Structure formats: structure tokens, C-alpha cells
């Protein structure tokens, strides 16, 4: 079931002021300001030149790093706070912070980007060109949980769309002998 998310652009990796980032574009109706300073996880696949598919999931487990879209501190955001709520964070500002350590054994520019590429190559066997055939997305790195003292509600990423999927599937599965074919269609994109 599709849910609002941040898809990585085809050439997402860049470095600015010695910080590595992924460029994104948002999918679905999001409130952009809600995506800053929130731990994010990376999910998706790299499709390599030889057709090999490398699945990626980073940030869901406690022992894994998370990612974040940084925001300005209130005392540094005098221009930003003049914007409307809808423009407080612009779409082109939804860039995900992914690292800051430079590659150690090299002289030159974009050493943080080079180090991130090295780490991705070591773990997944991918290169920068492999981002062109990748389908990668950033989502909140939070697990579903009970909400309220009485635990009467569920809080989770994607609940707005997914909350309808479970009862639809349950209804189909609980039909004993349908007069006609029972069907629930659950899709993404």
C-alpha cells in the first residue's frame, strides 16, 4: 500500500559544506515541515548492470543508523519563520543528511561523498552509477505503537492509507462461502 514518502532522485548523492546529503522529491500528500528533525529509514532496491537486485533497508533496527532532514535552529531561522506554514520547508529543502566523515586516504574535493560511496560499495556492492536504476525511498523510522493511556488508537507511519487495507483484507478472508468472487486490491503506484 503506498504511503507518503521521500523518493531519492536518480543522482541523489551530493556534498555541501562537508556534509553528505541525498536529494529527494516527495511522493503523496505530505506536510513538508513534518519531515524535518525526524529519524528516517532508507528502503528500496538497487538494480545492478548485470540484473542483480540488491535490497536495502537501513534505519529500522535499533542498532542501525538513522537519517534526518536538518532544520534551522529557531534563533537562526528569522527568514524561514516569515514564510507561510506551507512554504516553511520547501520541497527542494527536503535533503536527507547521510554523513559527515571524509574519506581518509585521499586529497581533493567531495571527500565525504567519496566516503559514503565507499561504505555503500562495501555493504551493497554498488557504485554511484547504480543510483540511476535504483528505487530508494526515505520513510519515518518509527514502529507502530499504541496511543493514549487506554491504548485505544494506533500511531504509525502510513496509517492514513493503510488503515483501510487491513479491514478490507480481513473482510475478504472472513467470507465463508461468497456468492461471487471476493477481492481486495492493494497496490503501490
Give residue spans per PLM region:
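N-terminal hydrophobic/helix-forming segments and targeting peptides
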Residues: 1-189
Amino acid at each position: 500500500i503506498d504511503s507518503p514518502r521521500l523518493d531519492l532522485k536518480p543522482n541523489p548523492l551530493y556534498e555541501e559544506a562537508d556534509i553528505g546529503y541525498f536529494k529527494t522529491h516527495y511522493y503523496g500528500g505530505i506536510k513538508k515541515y513534518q519531515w524535518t528533525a525526524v529519524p528516517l529509514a532508507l528502503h528500496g532496491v538497487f538494480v545492478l548492470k548485470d540484473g542483480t537486485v540488491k535490497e536495502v533497508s537501513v534505519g529500522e533496527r535499533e542498532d542501525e543508523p538513522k537519517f534526518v532532514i536538518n532544520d534551522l535552529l529557531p534563533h537562526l531561522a528569522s527568514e524561514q519563520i516569515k514564510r507561510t506554514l506551507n512554504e516553511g520547508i520547501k520541497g527542494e529543502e527536503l535533503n536527507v543528511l547521510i554523513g559527515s566523515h571524509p574519506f581518509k586516504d585521499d586529497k581533493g574535493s567531495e571527500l565525504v561523498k567519496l566516503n559514503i560511496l565507499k561504505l555503500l560499495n562495501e555493504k551493497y556492492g554498488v557504485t554511484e552509477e547504480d543510483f540511476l536504476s535504483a528505487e530508494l525511498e526515505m520513510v519515518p523510522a518509527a514502529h507502530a505503537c499504541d496511543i493514549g493511556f487506554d491504548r485505544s488508537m494506533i500511531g504509525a507511519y502510513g496509517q492514513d492509507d493503510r488503515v483501510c487495507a487491513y479491514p478490507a483484507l480481513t473482510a475478504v478472508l472472513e467470507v465463508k462461502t461468497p456468492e461471487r468472487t471476493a477481492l481486495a486490491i492493494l497496490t503501490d503506484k
